[in-house]
Amino acid sequence: LIYAQKGSGRRSGYYTDYTFAVKKEDQLVTIAKAYSGLTDKEIMEVSRFVTKNSLEKFGPVRTVKPELVFEIAFEGIGFSNRHKSGVALRFPRILRWRRDKKADEIDDIEEVKKLIR
């Protein structure tokens, strides 16, 4: 998780819209945005983390310390110029919060590209 934004409607008080990244050499590059998959309790935990760990803000978006790791499920994957990673996930959603993983254990973009057929 590298960016978060507050949701709308019932979720307007919480950070529920997330942007995720993968490693590309020595930097993090965006690969997907996801809005679903966490429980209400997890959303509250992530919101507290975002509030306490925001590094900068631009408009409604908060850049956060890259410490939380999530597993993302998706329907398809392909090359794209939309994300800095050069890859886009189709219909991404949060599968689970990987509390057992540290940020330096996230996938590298080269591993992700191997999924493209």
Label every PLM stretch briefly:
Residues L1-R117:
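Classical nucleotidyltransferase
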